[in-house]
Amino acid sequence: MSAAIYLVKGREKSVVRRHPWIFSRGIDRVEGNPQLGETVDVYGHDGKWLAKAAYSPESQIRARVWSFEKQDINRAFFVKRIQDAQLLREDVIERDGLTGYRLIAAESDGMPGVTIDRYQNFFVCQLLSAGAEHQKQNIVDALIEVFPDCNVYERSDVSVRKKEGLQETTGVLHGEMPPKSVVIEENGVKISVDIVGGHKTGFYLDQRDSRQQAMKYVKDKEVLNCFSYTGGFGLYALKGGAKRVINADVSQPALDTAKFNAELNEFDISKKRAVFLNADVFKLLREYRDQGTKFDVVIMDPPKFAESKAQLNGACRGYKDINMLAFEILKSGGTLLTYSCSGLMDLALFQKIIADAAVDAGRTVKFVERFEQAADHPVDTAYPEGFYLKGFACKVI
């Protein structure tokens, strides 16, 4: 008989509504001796069977639901999940001409703790939960069955694994080692991705729609692209006809790739058109403000400021500071394109921070457009936490 967990009376409601997380305080008792990541049956207080879940004894999220149906969690299970995810994305893959996209968006694709990004024929896995680690071989075997010619590389070098009792790890799981540069295409733009050494799994695929939408604000404009990384927004700004784009980032290797990406797309990167500036964005914004330097468009896409609730207040101050500075260096009629990828910061809070930043900058500002993560990053209706990326276009009057 498999191990099982029984829920505290009244705590069945979220599982019945198909939320995939079961917290430690919601568990009344554990039967058997489930090991790290092992699949357990989930029962209500009344003994009614509810779900199959992965057990994680060291995490506050004590179990993550694989399925609300009575089925084995094996290779065939993951084959079906991956096939369903690929089918869900077929339209956007064709529409946007994608050779790089998110194949599996963790809980939102019924695979909690599992992220899989595809770059050409390289599939990059992040396994962030005990259950995902326990099922690693089944997941890899399922990928091989669905995509026979695939190469699979693991980028589980993420600190959140420690909360699950896991060590950070990377390496080839199947096939070849990724080369230094894998070139993908989206919306007709070519982008070089460093799978092994880049941020996350190599690139920020979730901002694809925002990059495309940014193009309508940049024609014949002076653009400052903050936290530019490998130049994603800057590439779209050049494609959109920007007069000049300054890409600012603290990482010289990222800026070198940004320049390479511009050359890859055969954009004009003379100093009159494109600049790749190694700088601390916070200091740079203050320097521009103090010098009286102004821009038509500022793009503000910072890294995640809040990894935990304890960091949220500090993150709010950081977001407010950079957006206030951005408003201060915008010309009248200028546009701020600003984003937050911190899931702990909801849309209403982010909007309030931007509003407060406008007040502190002494500028009259209108919200004119809202942005969210790209369509290959879906949000399951039972899992609102899957909505994490938000952004605004703000017009300075």
Swiss-Prot record:
One Pfam family from the record: Methyltrans_SAM
Listed EC numbers: 2.1.1.191
Predominant subcellular localization, coarse grouping: cytoplasm
Enzyme class: transferase
UniProt key word Cytoplasm: yes
Catalyses which reaction(s): cytidine(1962) in 23S rRNA + S-adenosyl-L-methionine = 5-methylcytidine(1962) in 23S rRNA + S-adenosyl-L-homocysteine + H(+)
Subcellular location(s) per record: Cytoplasm
Coiled coil regions in record: none
Residues of the PUA domain: 2-80
Keyword tags: Cytoplasm, Methyltransferase, RNA-binding, rRNA processing, S-adenosyl-L-methionine, Transferase
SMART domains: PUA
CDD domains: AdoMet_MTases, PUA_RlmI, RlmI_M_like
Highest taxon above the source species: Bacteria
SUPFAM superfamilies cross-referenced by the UniProt entry: PUA domain-like, S-adenosyl-L-methionine-dependent methyltransferases
Gene Ontology molecular function: any one: rRNA (cytosine) methyltransferase activity
Gene3D superfamilies: PUA domain, RNA methyltransferase domain (HRMD) like, Vaccinia Virus protein VP39
UniProt keyword annotation of S-adenosyl-L-methionine present: yes
InterPro entries assigned: PUA, PUA-like_sf, PUA_sf, RLMI, RlmI-like_PUA, SAM-dep_methyl-trfase, SAM-dependent_MTases_sf
GO cellular component, one term: cytoplasm
HAMAP family the record matches: 23SrRNA_methyltr_I
Family: Belongs to the methyltransferase superfamily. RlmI family.
Free-text function comment from the UniProt entry: Specifically methylates the cytosine at position 1962 (m5C1962) of 23S rRNA.
PANTHER family: RIBOSOMAL RNA LARGE SUBUNIT METHYLTRANSFERASE (PTHR42873), S-ADENOSYLMETHIONINE-DEPENDENT METHYLTRANSFERASE DOMAIN-CONTAINING PROTEIN (PTHR42873:SF1)
Protein name: Ribosomal RNA large subunit methyltransferase I
